[in-house]
């Protein structure tokens, strides 16, 4: 193998080509590759962050759902307590009203009883006076006197 000018020219041309590629072609290629690697790494990092954000959002949504259920249960419990309180108040009010009506009825009965007693006293007094008058008119006759008393007793 002989080294001639052609081989030497080809070697120099190859070295110039390598130098040119290293100087002008290789850096943009490396920059493009590095930029692509950076984009891929950023995309993977963003995907990881998105997955974490999704997980956090799911946890937060679960917590909010638990809080909402707890709040709903608390509201239902308060409503049930209020319902029981209203029912108890209505029972107490009804018992009070019933007692009031019963007391009013007893008072009316007592008033009617007193009125009837008073009427009866007046009638007894009138009968006693009438009997006394009749006895005085017939005071001589004992049999008539006893008959009048018996009639008074029967009328009472």
Curated annotation (Swiss-Prot):
Keywords: ATP synthesis, Cell inner membrane, Cell membrane, CF(0), Hydrogen ion transport, Ion transport, Membrane, Transmembrane, Transmembrane helix, Transport. F-type ATPases have 2 components, F(1) - the catalytic core - and F(0) - the membrane proton channel. F(1) has five subunits: alpha(3), beta(3), gamma(1), delta(1), epsilon(1). F(0) has three main subunits: a(1), b(2) and c(10-14). The alpha and beta chains form an alternating ring which encloses part of the gamma chain. F(1) is attached to F(0) by a central stalk formed by the gamma and epsilon chains, while a peripheral stalk is formed by the delta and b chains. The keyword Hydrolase does not apply. It comes from Shewanella halifaxensis (strain HAW-EB4). The keyword Transmembrane applies. It comes from the Bacteria. It holds the Pfam family ATP-synt_B. PANTHER family: ATP SYNTHASE SUBUNIT B, ATP SYNTHASE SUBUNIT B', CHLOROPLASTIC. F(1)F(0) ATP synthase produces ATP from ADP in the presence of a proton or sodium gradient. F-type ATPases consist of two structural domains, F(1) containing the extramembraneous catalytic core and F(0) containing the membrane proton channel, linked together by a central stalk and a peripheral stalk. During catalysis, ATP synthesis in the catalytic domain of F(1) is coupled via a rotary mechanism of the central stalk subunits to proton translocation. It is found in: Cell inner membrane. This is ATP synthase subunit b. Belongs to the ATPase B chain family.
């Amino acid at each position: 193998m002989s080294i001639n000018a052609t081989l030497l020219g080809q070697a120099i041309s190859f070295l110039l080509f390598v130098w040119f590629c290293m100087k002008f072609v290789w850096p943009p290629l490396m920059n493009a590759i590095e930029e692509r690697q950076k984009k891929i790494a950023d995309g993977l990092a963003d995907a990881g962050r998105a997955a974490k954000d999704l997980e956090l959002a799911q946890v937060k949504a679960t917590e909010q759902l638990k809080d909402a259920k707890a709040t709903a249960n608390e509201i239902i419990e308060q409503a049930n307590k209020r319902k029981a309180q209203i029912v108890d108040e209505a029972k107490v009010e009804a018992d009070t009203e019933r007692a009031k009506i019963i007391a009013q009825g007893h008072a009316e009965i007592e008033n009617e009883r007193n009125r009837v007693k008073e009427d009866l006293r007046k009638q007894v007094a009138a009968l006693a006076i009438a009997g006394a008058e009749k006895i005085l008119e017939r005071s001589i006759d004992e049999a008539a006197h006893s008959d009048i008393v018996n009639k008074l007793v029967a009328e009472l």
